[in-house]
């Protein structure tokens, strides 16, 4: 069989491409060298958010698109994508609240709602100090002046990938993991004809009219097979989350910590709900640094942990 599309990579991008192609009637195959979602797609912050921080950078159109897609995911996978409240604390400095900061946060909240945040069915609101404190009782009360509450969503990222992969298969796609691409095959005139795949000790020639490289941080390895040299076009970055016992933080909703000098934010997200309304863990992250180590086994360093603790110490 000759496929119309061969997708290389079984993360959320790859399975999404496979589903899109298969649902349009294209003969589609997807191969993943490891397990589905074994890369970045199972190591995210577990959030489906519109990118509030991108408003700080003037990326209004990006936020609009992200919020539109958030609503699409809520509609298509309501069993996986759930509404999650977020709180942004308004902090004091030497007992004084910066009115400029408070006004800027309020303006950002309205812009987020009007850009598309309203689609979740709730608008942001201001919380008094005591209301905010109940959501993060381990925070020094003297630092907390008030807070803003808004809404985004959370998701089990790996389950979402598996669900999309199964849906692609239901539309006729051939979806295979533990299958490694070892070569790109071409016709005498240089046209791509498919790929050589190794699976279960067998060498399989997969013919395809089109190849989509969705290999994530390994995309340059696939390009090297095609171009004959390593292009070095991917700039790997490492984002680290630290996981702490929930009892250390006791936040019942997600908390956003702005990092002004980096123009970004850290998320403090409860995870693993228990029947009594508490949680098993809290995720704190993510950092964002360049990475030049082994891609197959990235490690968290003491510097990564120190960086996260530096930004959360005042909470």
For each predicted feature, which ranges?
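Active-site substrate-recognition segment that forms the wall
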Residues: 31, 79-85, 181, 205-206, ...
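Glycine-rich FAD pyrophosphate-binding loop
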Residues: 22-42
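Beta1/beta-strand and adjacent pyrophosphate-binding region of the FAD-binding site
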Residues: 1-13
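A conserved short coil-to-beta-strand element within the FAD-binding core of flavoproteins
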Residues: 177-193
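Gly/Ala-rich phosphate-binding loop of Rossmann-like dinucleotide-binding domains
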Residues: 18, 22, 169
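Helix-loop-beta segment of a Rossmann-like dinucleotide-binding subdomain
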Residues: 133-171, 194-196, 206, 287-296
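Dinucleotide-binding Rossmann-like beta1-alpha1 core, especially the glycine-rich loop
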Residues: 46-135, 265-266
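Core beta-strand elements of the Rossmann-like FAD/NAD(P) dinucleotide-binding domain
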Residues: 3, 201-210
